Amino acid sequence: MENSLKSSGKPLAAPKVGMVSLGCPKALVDSEQIITQLRAEGYEISGTYDGADLVVVNTCGFIDEAVQESLDAIGEALAENGKVIVTGCLGAKKSASGSGLIAEVHPKVLAVTGPHAVGEVMQAVHSHLPKPHDPFVDLVPAAGIKLTPRHYAYLKISEGCNHRCSFCIIPSMRGELVSRPVAEVMLEAENLFKSGVKELLVISQDTSAYGVDVKYRTGFWNGRPLKTRMTELVGALGELAAQYGAWVRLHYVYPYPHVDEIIPMMAQGPLKGHVLPYLDVPFQHAHPEVLKRMKRPANAERVLERVQKWREICPDLTIRSTFIAGFPGETDAQFETLLDFIRDAELDRVGCFAYSPVEGASANALDGALPDDVREARRARFMEVAEEVSAARIARKIGKTLKVLIDEVNAEGGIGRTAADAPEIDGVVYVEPAAKASKRYKVGEFVSVKITGADSHDLWGEV
């Protein structure tokens, strides 16, 4: 999420806190939890720097560009406001000297915490901006304070990760996997649906590993036992979504064997149309030698077989993935294997990063580092092939009538998304204005749209 605080406005006497949220959806959920707690304690949220008594900056520290963006945002907040508390992944990052990076670059910050640290952030806020005496807890909705539009929300089911991928430093910043109690997750989901959310995006560092840390302990929801495991959680969320006519979308699904159990829920039975036929699976590469150096599962042939089997069971399945091109030691032949994989798997939506060393990642010690121009050329070539595959798949939708969730309405019509499109990262559907009053649509509504055109990313249609 971009920094949305701007300079202007008048100073306000009430205790107000500004919030800058950077990074991934997991960080966004952390920001929402902080804002919810602030509101619960009677603080108000300011949309400007100079309208705030204090600013909290939630940072990202995954890649060098994100680190710099976070450091710049902290600097801007210090310049515009002066009282800044920093939280998030960058807070856990050390500098070359071994001290905290943020404190070294920006020594004037009031406090620094790591990610998923609502309690520590609130302690820092209390120290520098004492809370009001009479908090109005009833002013905070049961669903909490959200930074997303009212009709969709992220549901974080766990924190941390047990994997040790050589290119990643997330575990060193967010720690080992910690799964939320299943009843707590279900209660949050229910409150979100009750508040009008029509699409719930399930996120974590590793959604498929949900419950591993508690040995799939059995919890209880609505008086019945419910195992703390991805399969059972998705089934329960799908049942809940069906009651509200809503969608559940799965992100960060590591391809464990039990993911196969989810596909039939998407394809048939009462959960069809509610557990969306959509999987965000971070494959990262397809050649076994590269995957081995990445410390990722290395059976690409088996993965391709599974993808093809998933599509047999659920022909409408959309698969999104992310890849790294130019990883240390990647040969021309290994890169071609990667291109063959995305063609054969017919991946619908893909993103690709040119490999970039991340401070603290074990991949930095690998031999065979490739020049910047080679890495970037491979990324560009990868995206050319990926767009060809995507364009071919998306063209098949022309002439079909699809269910679309409207995100925006303007003078030119509407902008929405199908079951195949997650917000912000996938394509959209441009919907023509309704010709009749009976067909007019609003933000947050589902409408049936006949698809009339497509490119490699987006669709066009009419109600």
Curated annotation (Swiss-Prot):
Any one GO biological process: tRNA modification
One Pfam family of this chain: Radical_SAM
Alphabetized GO MF terms: 4 iron, 4 sulfur cluster binding; aspartic acid methylthiotransferase activity; metal ion binding; protein methylthiotransferase activity
Catalyzed reactions per annotation: L-aspartate(89)-[ribosomal protein uS12]-hydrogen + (sulfur carrier)-SH + AH2 + 2 S-adenosyl-L-methionine = 3-methylsulfanyl-L-aspartate(89)-[ribosomal protein uS12]-hydrogen + (sulfur carrier)-H + 5'-deoxyadenosine + L-methionine + A + S-adenosyl-L-homocysteine + 2 H(+)
Cofactor: [4Fe-4S] cluster
Annotated residues for binding of [4Fe-4S] cluster 2: C161, C165, C168
Cellular compartment(s): Cytoplasm
Domain named Radical SAM core: residues: 147-392
Gene3D superfamilies: Methylthiotransferase, N-terminal domain, Nucleic acid-binding proteins, tm_1862 like domain
TRAM domain boundaries: 395-463
Record keywords, A-Z: 4Fe-4S, Cytoplasm, Iron, Iron-sulfur, Metal-binding, S-adenosyl-L-methionine, Transferase
Family: Belongs to the methylthiotransferase family. RimO subfamily.
Protein name: Ribosomal protein uS12 methylthiotransferase RimO
Organism of this sequence: Burkholderia pseudomallei (strain 668)
Highest classification ranks of the organism: Bacteria, Pseudomonadati, Pseudomonadota, Betaproteobacteria, Burkholderiales
Record gene name: rimO
